[in-house]
C-alpha cells in the first residue's frame, strides 16, 4: 500500500511548488509512472483524489501516464522498449525482446515523477 505514501509525497510537492509560486489554484498535474515503479495507477489516482480534498489541488485535472520499460542489452546490443512479465507483481521479469537475455540494463521505467504543474495566480490589478 505504498501508493498512499507516494500520493502524499506528490501532493506535498505540488502544494509546496504552487505556494512558492503564489498560486491560488492548481488546475493540472501531470504524473509519469514507470512500469517498474510498482505503483498501481488506479490506486494512486484514488489516493490522490482523497488527499487533495480541501486543498488548492482539489479541482485539478490529474493526468497519469504509464512509462514503458526501456532497456539496453549488452548481449545483442538491443536498445529500446521491452515487455514486462509482471505475473508476479513483486518481482517482474524484464528480458531483451531480441535475444531473451535477462541480464540487461534498465534505462527508463523505474521512476514516479511529477512532470508538470499548471497553476492559477492572482490577477495583478
UniProtKB/Swiss-Prot annotation:
Keywords (A to Z) from UniProt: Metal-binding, Nickel, Zinc
Coiled coil (UniProt feature): none
Molecular-function annotations in GO: nickel cation binding; zinc ion binding
Binding site for Ni(2+): 2
GO BP: protein maturation; protein modification process
Any matching Pfam family: HypA
Keyword hit for Magnesium: no
List of residues binding Zn(2+): 73, 76, 96, 99
UniProt record similarity statement: Belongs to the HypA/HybF family.
Purpose: Involved in the maturation of [NiFe] hydrogenases. Required for nickel insertion into the metal center of the hydrogenase.
Protein name in UniProt: Hydrogenase maturation factor HypA
Amino acid at each position: 500500500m505504498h501508493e498512499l505514501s507516494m500520493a502524499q509525497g506528490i501532493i506535498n510537492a505540488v502544494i509546496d511548488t504552487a505556494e512558492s509560486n503564489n498560486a491560488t489554484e492548481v488546475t493540472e498535474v501531470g504524473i509519469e509512472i514507470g512500469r517498474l515503479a510498482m505503483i498501481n495507477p488506479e490506486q494512486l489516482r484514488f489516493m490522490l483524489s482523497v488527499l487533495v480534498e480541501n486543498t488548492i489541488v482539489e479541482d485539478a485535472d490529474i493526468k497519469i501516464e504509464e512509462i514503458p520499460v526501456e532497456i539496453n542489452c549488452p548481449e545483442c546490443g538491443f536498445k529500446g522498449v521491452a515487455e514486462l512479465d509482471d505475473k508476479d507483481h513483486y518481482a517482474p521479469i524484464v528480458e531483451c525482446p531480441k535475444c531473451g537475455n535477462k541480464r540487461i540494463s534498465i534505462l527508463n521505467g523505474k521512476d514516479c515523477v511529477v512532470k508538470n504543474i499548471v497553476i492559477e495566480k492572482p490577477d495583478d490589478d
